[in-house]
Amino acid sequence: MKNYLVLLVTLVFALAGCKSDKKTETDTPLKELNILEKVAEAHGYDNWKNVSSLKFTFNVDRDSSHFERTWLWQPKSNEVVFMTREDTITYNRKAVDSLSAKTDGGFVNDKFWLLAPYQLVWDQKGFTYEHSENQEAPISKEKMHKLTIVYANEGGYTPGDAYDYYFGNDYVIKEWVFRKANQEEPSMVTSWEDYKTLQGLDIATMHKMPEANFQLYFTNVEVK
């Protein structure tokens, strides 16, 4: 009888422990995403962790002129290969020196255009931001969300610059404004168009300026 009571008490405590664990698991709240993370996630940011290499060609057409350069980036090792018709340069972003700084500046610029939604997460400690709703987008004139980020005045290749992102309730960017040194007037306004999904990454491959013979776009985008 004594052994039976001991077994019964042990079983009761075991069941209570299981019930308590289940309650803890159920009651654990999910982390609420901030606006930066919501925009990044809307563009497939959750799949970035699976990317081992990214190759793309950055193109600019202005009037009759054309400019392009190609990059191959291995984000886990941070090795970058820069390719043009004239030259090929390989360097590592963990060890940028005076010789590779200019090349790295070009890479940072081109990568920012390609992966700006992800930069909201990667760079969030380096800028301040403000989010508002029902703001008129500069190109379409539609009412959208507006997210303004202003980079710190120190560090990076373009300190103090500001960007205004415009998007709908799906958090997918439709337009943006670049304001150099956080000046009030826009330095550049472009659309975000021709989204393509590559290995779960949703990337805008075309940016056009209204009423201007200018387009910035990406070709040969490969994600592995």
Model regions: which residues?
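Sec-dependent signal peptide recognition
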Residues: K2-L8
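Flexible, processing/modification-adjacent segments and terminal tails
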Residues: Y91-D161, Q183
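N-terminal mature ectodomain segment of secretory-pathway/periplasmic proteins
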Residues: D27, E32-A101, G126-F127, H131-E136
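Bacterial signal peptide processing site
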Residues: K19-D21
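C-terminal motif of bacterial Sec signal peptides marking the signal peptidase cleavage site
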Residues: A14-G17
